[in-house]
Amino acid sequence: MLLIGASCSDDDNTLSYSTGAVQNTELKTILVQRGYTFNEDGNLLLDDLANNTTTLDLSGTQISTDALAELSMFPNLTDVDLSDNGYGPAFDFAKLPEQITGIDLTGNEIYDYDNLVSVVVEENGDETVTNLHEITKLYLPETAKENIEDLVRFYRQNKEAITAGTIDMKMTDVDGNLQTYTTLRDVPDANLLTYLQTNFADLFNGDQIDLSKHLGLDQKTKELLVAPADNVTNFEGIQFLVENPYWEGAKISLYSAGEESIASMPNIKVGKFITQVILQNIEVEDIDLSNATDLRSAWVQNNPALQKLDLSYSTIWGQGDKETEGNGTYGSSLMVLGCPILKEIKLPEKNELKAYRIDIECLDALETFDMSNVKMVAELSIGDLNKDFNLVYPELTIFYSEDGYAGTYFACSENTFYRESTQAFLKANYTDIDPDDTVRRLGYTSSLSYDKNKGCRWRTLLNKQK
């Protein structure tokens, strides 16, 4: 770290410069424009301007967070405005010099606040929270309302100082106005509010979720199921349960009021205890599965906003034995239906994956999805896809099913049937198999899951090609 307040003098001992030199050219340009002076080596002239600088406005400059450590060249700087700099989704407090205790992060899209606090959780659930950076002022963007892991714990740890005004902690509202930070969050949809109050009452303070509260044992592991009959059209507020570090439910199943009523939902980050995610008729731009290491099943249907679905973080999906993966209840499953702008699907990067079900249909924008490392799948359904998509089929080597009839039941749409890769897949696993082979590789079905896609009679079409 650069030495704070250290300086060096020129030969006539009349000028003093910072020991640390600026390395970031963007930062140097900004500071020169503000009237600061540097020598040819990049050392800051410690004149009255530099020595009297206690606050520095870098808002709207888009300055890289990697340059922030160089601000330690200012001997008396304690407060920096970093608003509207395009930061996000994370901000790392470790990049700030220790001397800076006041920071304005408003106008950025930051969800995670790394190295603000450290948290040690005991076996009984008790937490020890330690501040990693001294803070006297913390102004936060509206997106900070989503963060529980860092900010709520910081707030709880420093509540006395915040209440007394020793720490000035504020957060902008949806209109961009600074408000006193609070752990209370609204649930706008009355039906969702009723559901959450009924099933997760421990989180509430009146009609608001209080992020500082913990869930009791009976609610801590309760599964999240919002059914169509619950008539939810806005899932704002659900993230405060899904991302709550004190909720350990294994399943998330969210359905809108109906197929003709697409519900809105904020982006969510799924926790490490989740094994199943179902989202139907819900518009959400991002489903972050980076912590979902136990995820075994994902079903996303009718999502007009999702562009990427990444299951690669799971240490469970497709990695069981053939008996487990061939079971309809316990086997790995992926269903992605009716997501018109989805571009990418990723599976775990293992040499051999086994699954119970893979079903992809009506994905008009799909560009990337490689199934070649899938060596066993009990049910494979491929509907209409982007016509320019390079469809890479599973390279099947394991043929197992509980009914003993066929290793893989296969269904496809007519458009998919005529793809070259489908013809090659059928040739390798159905048309050209050895008649003496006792293993039936492909079983026939013409049924697809998605009502906007029609399965074809691919056996009939094969016979017509003879």
List each language-model region with its residue ranges:
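Sec-dependent bacterial lipoprotein signal peptides
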Residues: M1-A6
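N-terminal capping/linker segments that flank leucine-rich repeat
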Residues: C8-E70, D79, E109-Y111, N115-S261, ...
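Inter-repeat linker/turn residues at the boundaries of leucine-rich repeats
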Residues: N51, S72-P75, K95-E98, T130-H133, ...
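Conserved LRR concave beta-strand detector
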Residues: T55, N76-D81, T101-D104, E134-Y139, ...
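Canonical leucine-rich repeat
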Residues: L56, T65-L71, A90-L96, Y113-V119, ...
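Per-repeat beta-strand-to-loop junction in leucine-rich repeat
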Residues: S59, S83-D84, D104-G107, Y139-E142, ...
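Canonical position 11/12 of the leucine-rich repeat
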Residues: Q62-S64, G86-G88, E109-Y111, K145, ...
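Ankyrin-repeat and related helical/solenoid repeat scaffolds used for protein-protein interactions
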Residues: G88, F93-E142, E344, K350-F417
